[in-house]
């Protein structure tokens, strides 16, 4: 199994020197997040507002070659700030994770520590009122995790979130993403591709998501292909807060068998 944590880059736009003051309409709009599931959305945090999106707890399990691995992430927060009417900056960091492995002989090993830092910049390219939404999302991963949790390499890429609203409360999301990844031997870099299709249906304050996801890692030592089916449910008890729960089911041997999580997002 190969688990790759992607992180994100800031492309620094020109920002006015005065302090941003959110408008009443922006502050009253329902929260829009890049969770649950693996998809990103074209929406951005309103100018001058902060937003936090985080797993409360994530559990990952995988069986491969006679070895079972379980990983726990104790929160996985993303901090966002609205830079303008159509752009925001985002920082993601795993403050603590624990990996427990047991091989076929019954030997157990445990590894724990912090994760990598991901920095992202999102620029929405379309009007927020249209049925078609498009954004560009460059990112970079900063290697802050210890060996065994991260690969110790600077990596990055660019995602292009695409959202299409369909009558009846449906939303279709596409998520093409190009990645620049470190070679497994640490001697160079290569390309990767991530793609997904996500279909969501809103029921009042609840939204149900179904998603098919793939990652294609074109490492010179051998291409690593991952596929998963992801399902989740989000609930908005009020316009500035969201709770969610979800599961990702691996569809091939290179993908973790099961990932389960609960999360919360809030804006202020």
Question: What positions do the PLM features span?
Answer:
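Sec/Tat signal peptide C-region and signal peptidase I cleavage site
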Residues: 12-16
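Transmembrane beta-barrel domains of Gram-negative outer membranes and organellar outer membranes
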Residues: 17-268
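Hydrophobic alpha-helical transmembrane segments of integral membrane proteins
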Residues: 9-10, 135
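Sec-dependent signal peptide recognition
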Residues: 1-7
């Amino acid at each position: 199994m190969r688990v790759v944590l992607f992180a994100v880059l800031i492309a620094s736009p020109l920002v006015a020197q005065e302090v941003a003051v959110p408008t009443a309409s922006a502050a009253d709009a329902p929260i829009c997040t890049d969770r649950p599931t693996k998809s990103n959305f074209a929406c951005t945090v309103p100018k001058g507002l902060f937003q936090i999106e985080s797993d409360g707890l994530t559990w990952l399990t995988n069986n491969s070659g006679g070895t079972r691995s379980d990983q726990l992430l104790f929160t996985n927060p993303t901090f966002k700030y609205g830079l303008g009417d159509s752009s925001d900056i985002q920082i993601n960091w795993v403050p603590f994770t624990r990996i427990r492995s047991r091989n076929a002989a019954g030997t157990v090993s445990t590894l724990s520590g912090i994760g990598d830092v991901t920095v992202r910049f999102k620029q929405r390219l379309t009007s927020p009122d249209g049925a078609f939404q498009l954004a560009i999302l460059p990112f970079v991963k900063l290697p802050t995790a210890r060996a065994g949790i991260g690969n110790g390499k600077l990596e990055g890429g660019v995602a292009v979130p695409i959202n299409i609203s369909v009558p009846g409360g449906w939303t279709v999301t596409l998520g093409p993403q190009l990645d620049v990844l470190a070679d497994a031997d640490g001697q160079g870099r290569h390309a990767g591709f991530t793609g997904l299709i996500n279909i969501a249906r809103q029921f009042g304050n609840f939204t149900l998501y179904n998603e098919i996801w793939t990652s294609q890692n074109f490492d010179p030592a051998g291409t690593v292909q991952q596929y998963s089916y992801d399902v989740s449910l989000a609930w908005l008890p009020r316009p500035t807060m969201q709770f969610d729960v979800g599961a990702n089911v691996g569809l091939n041997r290179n993908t973790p068998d099961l990932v389960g999580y609960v999360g919360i997002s809030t804006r202020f």
